[in-house]
Regions:
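Surface-exposed loop/turn motifs in large extracellular/passenger domains
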Residues: 1-12, 17-38, 43-79, 87-106, ...
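Extracellular, surface-exposed repeat/solenoid domains
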Residues: 174-178, 182-239
Length: 240
């Protein structure tokens, strides 16, 4: 599905839902949803959801959501406004591409990559593997990843204001920043791999918080297993 130069509101659903090996691409759109899903217990209440239902009506594969020069809003009038994440990915492999797109939501939860209660896939084996690419993009909000899910977050000329994987629950959580990107750290965060074109780490605004990384992962060899004091008194340090 490709949509350009459009404005719309859905008062009984999410902004967009992708099932299986399908894609949605938005350009210069202004879309609003109520973040209302159909799963039990509200597990799929989200602004945008990428998933695989296993019902047979969509091929297995990568689900891709892309938006450029657009605005995505969870309506403040929705009963889900204060609780629903902007993005939820479950039981699938997914890609989210955002370029110069405004996100408006009230929960403080940017992204949840996680399994579900068994409605889609087998509970305990229905996590997600997500690649999230941000280009000229402002991102703000909590990022959570559960023990059966992975996230690769790539920032290009973008800003991230977030606590990432605060429970240290993610199976793998990788963050990559180019030299023109900034991570404003709002709380203790755990990453598997940290890649930064700015090897001085000056583009990480730590606010006194701690970032833990996996010193046994060869992709972190440039950090030499060290504890590094960041500019605002926080540290980047190996996880125990």
């Amino acid at each position: 599905i490709n949509v350009s130069d459009s404005k719309g509101k859905a008062t009984g659903s999410s902004i967009a839902v992708i099932e299986g090996k399908n894609s949605i691409e938005l350009n210069n759109c202004d879309l609003t949803g109520y973040a209302i899903g159909r799963g039990t217990g509200g597990v799929d209440d989200a602004g945008v959801m990428v998933y695989q239902s296993m019902s047979g009506d969509a091929d297995n594969g990568v689900g891709t959501f892309s938006a450029s020069d657009s605005k995505l809003t969870i309506d403040p009038a929705s009963g889900k406004y204060s609780t629903a994440p902007m993005f939820f990915v479950t039981n699938t492999e997914g890609v989210i591409n955002l370029t110069n797109t405004e996100l408006s939501f009230g929960s403080g939860k940017l992204l949840n990559v996680a399994g579900n209660n068994g409605e889609w896939g087998t509970k305990g084996a229905n996590g997600a593997d997500l690649t999230f690419n941000a280009d000229n993009q402002n991102l703000e909000g909590l990022i959570t990843v559960d023990k059966i899910s992975t996230l690769k977050l790539n920032l290009k000329s973008s800003t991230l204001k977030s606590t990432v994987n605060s429970a240290n629950s993610g199976k793998e959580v990788d963050i990559s920043l180019d030299k023109n990107s900034t991570w404003n750290v709002t709380g203790t965060s755990y990453v598997t791999v940290l890649t930064d074109e700015d090897t001085s780490l000056d583009n990480i605004k730590d606010n006194g918080n701690t970032i833990y990384y996996d010193s046994s992962n060869s992709s972190n060899s440039w950090l030499e297993g060290k504890t590094i004091t960041l500019n605002d008194g926080g540290v980047l340090t190996p996880a125990e």
